[in-house]
Design a protein with these regions (language model features):
Chain C
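Transmembrane alpha-helical segments of polytopic membrane transport and secretion proteins
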Residues: 1-39, 122-124, 307-317
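A structural signal for multi-pass alpha-helical bundles of membrane permease subunits
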Residues: 34-317
Length: 281, 436, 317
């Protein structure tokens, strides 16, 4: 049994100090939520208390979003693209990380560094030459353009993270499997991957987040309204010159954050333990 | 007529692989012709709906599949650059703000001489034809402009005992009195399009300009510029709040509609949205739209001039459908279609054609009575110089607003600020010289 | 480096006498065709979609390319012109201030937050999840809410400060050049802090308990344990996180583009936003590319040195 003093102490040394961080993190999001629920007349009235809703909650902004725009199509597009790009990147990342972690071959070290260096290339610049490539591949104006280009910034991170994770797994078990006649691919899939699940989930979650948030490529490579992704769609339709539809924009942000929030709720523990092994080594 | 373009062919090939998963579009059917149009989300949404209706109507008549894609105007630059780089994208595209795109993308825009001469006589002629010709050619059609009148709170003016202020000096006086009772004057002075518009209007009204008629000589260093700058300094310190330095294009609308600003230099969009959202004057039940009026853009000691965003439309010459696209432009620029389109936009989108400036919509609401007057004194932002990629860069880098603001805030003396702007502009214009 | 690791492992295995011979183990790590086959997809993806466009970008920075034109070679002319431009020099200074300040804030606050999160027992998942949120909400939209919070007229921040009578006037968050820089740094910190906190938390979890117990029995207090156990063992993680974040912070676009567009008086322009104006809005790709790549040689050197250090540190664990 702990004494009351011992139970209360963490309140002051731990929970109280952590509060400012939580507030700092959450306040803008709270503000986003209430903005999306306020009536315009209250939203644009300078005399009201900004962080309360006094004149009644309205779902009007959400209605505007789902009735007057193609929000749900955009939402589905974002989902398709993010899932597909994540799967592609994680698979490529696993394949690339394995030899880097386990094998010795000419050029291995240089490739490891090259992967990191790709991050030094500013995307704000890369997209112009890339648009030529996308067009030559005949992918403009299709979601494929995004499934193909997103891995350019996802694969390096996935590889790097998984490389670290694989290194933490003892290689003896694999060697045994190989002596038993498994080939490399079988060893990787049957022996290594099951142990590396947290690392893979961590990489996938990260890749999904980055794809879901991507804006520039989605804007440039895909034009038709019904093929836009969520962020591009919301911003295209709800910022009209010198008029911002604040309620609608914030409603889009709220609904648009849900899938990732749900993903993190389920996988948060894996995320931390995946990073623990992957990023640390 | 139907040709399989290389792009369509590639798409079909790629689509074959993609087809199974049906990601994105279904493989394009090569037999139907498709015309695509990239436009910006209009400030009055009904405008887009009417454009879409006309586009589809034309498509149905000509058995052409049509697609109108709308993006936010801030994203247009990125999109244009990517399409030109890839030599692929839409057939028709919105261009602007400003006519600079015609110079910037001169080699990638189809000649529109024939269309421009066709549509002009039916609509009473172009407002100021020579302004729109780039290197002597029609590379784009000027499409619409939102003229900048002065939007003003009539109830506050009455309270101050002011009657129809007309000069910039009048507005300084009104703003000063207004600020004393919590209702300052409002004009953006930061990195925004509105700041460019209003500060250029003031510069010209005091007799200044930044580039000569030859499109080469930088003329910013003048005593007229100094006068304009001293005026803006007084306007900033005596009649406005420092927040104007951070304003974007939407901020002055909010300032007026929130009941704070006594007057703003802005198109009618603020009024339109106040009317739609039924915003009230704070502390009363009165709708703010009822106490807003729009009057003439102010006059200075030398002149009465203003500018605005010149939104244009053009056809990429790498499009496979140049003739079809021209055909749609002719259709859209028919008087009855333009009329309907202006009607839908409540007059916010004023074409650069004489007859349209006399559209009945400008008589339908007392609010709009000065809009055609403002249009008459509206010139391109590079006035008196021609529109070039360089003048566009002066606009995009906000050289004019920064010059004014650096002096107004006391960061620099007038001479320092002018010298700074002069040097930046010279660099820009020198770097833009075309190779022979 | 790879070699050493392998030899170390072999030695370990041999010593335990439970592994195949060193010769076989050595054979197992030499499988070049398989290595290339596995790396193939990543290699070709990066070659066509990153390396090729990147080389083109390098060319742009050395040419007078405009949008749509390849341009002709002009040497370092673009860079020379940049160095003559007052706006660029200001941008350079802004980028350094922005990155240094945001990184410092994120490192210090991230470390504090990670230490706190590590000790949580109750509401652990809830609180960890909450502080992670800013990182996962789409940036393009979350930046808008920050703008709405600092927008001069409706600023909820100013409203609160005034209501609490802390100030009696509107603080010019975005109109004042220095406050504007502060604001964009703040928003960048808000967004990047979770990445630091969670990754450092992961690093903390990995530190063996025994080391703390040993330090405690040697008489080290909490501060001593922090400096002598936590910090040295977190160094490799810290190095990687800071490196990553430095690259992304330096390339930040959205926050400045939404909040200030580089204003007031270009005092918040960063490389990405200035390059956007020059390269895209004005169509001078060469100039824009030069802005983007201005720091590339320095960054490249930093990455090489730091990766080397990180690997060494990881190896001697």
């Amino acid at each position: 049994m702990t004494s009351p003093g011992r139970r209360i102490r963490p309140l002051f040394t731990l929970y109280l100090p952590v509060m400012p961080f939580v507030l700092f993190a959450l306040f803008p999001l709270y503000f986003m939520l209430i903005t999306s629920l306020k009536k315009n007349s209250e939203l644009y009235d300078v005399t009201t208390v900004p962080f309360l809703i006094k004149r009644g909650v309205t779902l009007g902004h959400y209605q505007l979003l789902s009735q007057d725009t193609l929000f749900w199509s955009w939402f589905v597009n974002s989902l398709i693209v993010s899932v597909a790009a994540t799967v592609v990147s994680v698979v490529i990342g696993i394949l690339a990380a394995y030899p880097l972690a386990r094998l010795r071959f000419p050029g291995g070290d240089s490739f490891g560094v090259a992967i990191f260096v790709t991050y030094l290339v500013p995307p704000s610049l890369l997209f112009l030459p890339l648009s030529t490539v996308v067009n030559r591949l005949g992918l403009s104006d299709s979601l494929w353009a995004l499934v193909v280009t997103y891995p350019t910034f996802l694969v390096p991170f996935c590889t790097w993270l998984l490389l670290g994770y694989f290194r933490t797994v003892p290689k003896e078990i694999e060697e045994c499997a190989m002596l038993d006649g498994c080939n490399r691919l079988q060893t990787l899939v049957r022996i290594l991957l099951p142990v590396a699940v947290p690392g893979v989930i961590c990489a996938a979650l990260f890749a999904f987040t980055l794809s879901w948030n991507e804006f520039l490529y989605a804007l440039v490579f895909v034009s038709p309204a019904e093929l836009k992704t969520m962020t591009v769609g919301v911003i295209s339709e709800l910022i009209r010159g010198d008029i911002y539809y604040w309620g609608g924009l914030m409603a889009g942000a709220c609904v648009g954050s849900l899938p990732i929030v749900i993903a993190y709720v389920f996988f948060l523990d894996y995320y931390v333990s995946g990073l623990t092994a992957g990023a640390v080594k | 007529m139907a040709r399989v373009s290389r792009r369509q062919f590639l798409r079909v090939t790629a689509g074959g692989a993609a087809g199974a998963l049906a990601l994105g579009r279904a493989p394009a059917v090569a037999q139907t012709r498709e015309l695509t149009f990239l436009s910006i989300a209009s400030f009055v949404p009904e405008t887009d709906k009417e454009l879409k209706r006309q586009f589809e109507e034309w498509g149905a008549k000509n058995k052409v599949k049509v697609r109108l894609d709308i993006i936010a105007h801030l994203q247009l630059q990125t999109k244009k650059a990517a399409e030109v780089q890839a030599r692929s994208g839409h057939d028709l595209t919105a261009l602007g703000p400003g006519l600079g795109d015609a110079d910037l993308y001169f080699d990638y825009l189809a000649d529109l001489n024939d269309v421009a001469t066709d549509v002009a006589p039916k609509n009473g002629g172009w407002l100021s034809q020579s302004d729109y010709l780039i290197r002597g050619k029609w590379k784009l059609l000027p499409w619409w402009q939102p003229p900048f009148p002065m939007a003003v709170r009539t109830d506050l003016l009455e309270k101050l005992g002011e009657k129809s202020p007309d000069t910039w000096e009048d507005w300084l006086r009104v703003g000063k009195k207004g600020k004393a009772m919590g209702h300052p004057f409002g004009t953006a002075m930061g990195h925004s399009g509105d700041a460019n518009v209003t500060l250029l209007s003031i510069l010209w009204s005091y007799g200044g300009s930044y580039v000569g008629k030859d499109g080469k000589t930088i003329t910013i260093n003048s005593k007229e510029t100094r006068q304009a700058m001293d005026f803006v300094k007084r306007l900033y310190t005596e009649a406005m709040d420092p927040e104007v330095l951070a304003w974007d294009d939407a901020s002055n609308n909010r300032c007026l509609n929130a009941g704070k600003c006594i007057a703003i230099h802005n198109p009618i969009s603020a009024y339109e949205s106040a009317k739609k959202d039924k915003v009230v004057v704070p502390g009363t039940q009165k709708e703010i739209a009822e106490v807003i009026d729009h009057i003439h853009t102010p006059r200075g000691p030398a002149d009465r001039k203003a500018t605005t965003g010149f939104w244009c439309v053009g056809i990429w010459n790498f499009s496979k459908n140049v003739d079809l696209a021209k055909d749609f432009l002719r259709y859209h620029f028919q008087p009855e279609n333009l009329n309907k389109w202006v009607e839908a936009g409540h007059g916010f989108n004023m074409p650069f054609l004489t007859n349209l400036t006399r559209h009945p919509v400008y008589k339908s609401d007392k609010q709009y009575r000065f809009i055609p007057e403002v249009a008459k004194v509206t010139v391109p932002p590079s006035w008196p110089g021609p529109n070039t990629a360089a003048s566009q860069q002066v606009w995009d880098l906000y050289i004019i607003p920064d010059m004014f603001a650096q002096h107004a805030t006391g960061k620099m003396t007038a001479d320092q600020a002018i010298a700074w702007a002069e040097k930046e502009m010279q660099e820009i214009y020198a770097g833009r010289k075309r190779k022979p | 480096m790879q070699l050493k690791t392998v030899e170390g492992d072999v030695a370990k295995l041999a010593a335990r006498g439970e592994a195949p011979t060193a010769g076989l183990s050595d054979f197992l790590v030499r499988d070049t065709p398989v290595a290339y086959a596995f790396i193939g997809p990543a290699f070709f993806l990066l070659l066509f979609l990153v390396a090729y466009p990147f080389v083109l970008s390098l060319w742009f920075s050395l040419s007078d390319a405009r949008v749509g034109e390849t341009g002709s070679f002009v040497g370092l002319d673009n860079f020379a012109r940049l160095l003559r431009s007052g706006i660029f020099l200001q941008t350079l200074q802004n980028s350094i201030v922005f990155t240094a300040a945001a990184l410092t804030l994120k490192t210090v606050l991230g470390m504090i937050l990670a230490l706190l999160l590590f000790r949580l027992v109750r509401f652990k998942r809830l609180i960890r999840g909450a502080v992670l949120l800013p990182f996962i909400v789409p940036t393009a939209l979350s930046t808008l809410v920050w703008w709405w919070m600092f927008e001069p007229l409706y600023s909820v921040v100013n409203w609160t400060l005034k209501s609490l009578h802390i100030v009696n006037y509107d603080i010019p968050w975005l109109p004042d050049p220095y406050l504007a820089m502060f604001t964009v740094i703040l928003v960048n910190t808000w967004r990047g802090l979770p990445f630091f906190a969670i990754t450092l938390l992961a690093g903390l979890v990995a530190i063996p308990r025994e080391l703390y117990e040993a330090a405690e029995s040697d008489g080290a207090g909490p501060i001593g344990r922090f400096w002598h156990v936590t910090v040295p063992l977190l160094k490799p993680v810290l190095a990687v996180v800071i490196l990553f974040s430095a690259i992304f912070t330096l390339a930040d676009f959205n926050i400045v583009y939404v909040l200030t567009k580089g204003g007031p008086f270009n005092m918040t322009h960063l490389f990405a936003t200035y390059s956007f104006v020059l390269g895209l809005q004005s169509g001078q790709i060469g100039q824009g590319a030069a802005v983007s790549l201005f720091l590339f040689p320095i960054l490249l050197a930093v990455v090489f040195v730091q990766l080397r250090m990180v690997r060494k540190a990881a190896m001697y664990d």
